[in-house]
């Protein structure tokens, strides 16, 4: 039997491989694998970079929101300060109007002939009945009071002689011997205005404190709604 040399009838081992009917050299295959691996690695790195960038962007966004919130709070306080100034100016204007009204009202009433007549009668009743002469100094702004006083005193103490004088001031002065009393409508008005100012100041401070806190809370809530910060 003749032994055939199989090696002679066999093609040498090729370094080529067939993929889908296309012969590809091994080196080309390895190159393709390397490219694929590098592509995969590049994608992984790209994903990491994107994630890191996204994370950083989110951090920056949160920082921006926080910064915006702080700026918002600062702006809110500036608005509050402006509000305080405007409010105080308005309150001062209102207070002046109230004080002017009270001054006008009291000035009319405190110069009323019935009040002066009553004061004079009460003062006379506190003196001894030996009073025979009475000096009364009236402000020129109330000349019309003379006849009223003369009539009232004649009814009350017909035995007392009245000497009337006038002054440029606003006070009423009653004299009998060494006894002197002075009635100042302006002092009464000033006292009432001081008492009123104290009450208004106390109420204003309480009212403003409550209102300011309410406005600050509202501004903070509005800022949080506009700039939500996710943990």
Curated annotation (Swiss-Prot):
Entry keyword set: Cytoplasm, Plasmid, Protein transport, Transport, Virulence
Annotated function: Component of the type III secretion system (T3SS), also called injectisome, which is used to inject bacterial effector proteins into eukaryotic host cells. Acts as a regulator of the Spa47/SctN ATPase activity. It down-regulates the ATPase activity of the oligomeric Spa47/SctN, while it up-regulates the activity of the monomeric form. Important for translocation of MxiH/SctF, the major needle component.
Coiled coil location: none
GO BP field: protein transport
One CC-aspect GO term: cytoplasm
The protein, known as: Type 3 secretion system stator protein
Observed phenotype of the null mutant: Inactivation of the gene abolishes the ability of bacteria to assemble a complete type III secretion apparatus (T3SA) and therefore to secrete the translocon proteins IpaB/SctE and IpaC/SctB, and decreases the amounts of the needle filament proteins MxiH/SctF and MxiI/SctI. Mutant is unable to invade HeLa cells.
């Amino acid at each position: 039997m003749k032994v055939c040399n199989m090696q002679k009838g066999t093609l040498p081992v090729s370094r080529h491989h067939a993929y889908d009917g296309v012969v590809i050299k091994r080196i080309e295959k390895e190159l393709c694998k390397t490219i694929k691996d590098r592509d995969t690695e590049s994608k992984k790195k790209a994903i990491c970079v994107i994630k890191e960038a996204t994370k950083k962007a989110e951090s920056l966004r949160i920082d921006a929101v926080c910064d915006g919130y702080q700026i918002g709070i600062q702006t809110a306080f500036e608005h509050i300060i402006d509000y305080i100034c405007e409010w105080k100016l308005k309150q001062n204007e209102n207070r002046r109007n109230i004080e002017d009204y009270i001054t006008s009202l009291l000035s009319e009433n405190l110069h009323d002939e019935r009040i002066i007549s009553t004061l004079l009668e009460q003062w006379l009743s506190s003196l001894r009945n030996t009073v025979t002469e009475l000096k009364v100094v009236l402000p020129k702004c109330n000349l019309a009071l003379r006849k009223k006083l003369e009539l009232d005193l004649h009814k009350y103490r017909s035995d007392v002689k009245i000497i009337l004088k006038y002054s440029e001031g606003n006070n009423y002065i009653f004299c009998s011997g060494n006894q002197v009393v002075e009635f100042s409508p302006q002092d009464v008005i000033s006292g009432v205005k001081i008492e009123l100012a104290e009450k208004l100041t106390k109420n204003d401070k309480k009212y403003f404190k409550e209102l300011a806190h309410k406005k600050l809370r509202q501004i903070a809530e509005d800022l949080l709604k506009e700039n939500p910060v996710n943990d």
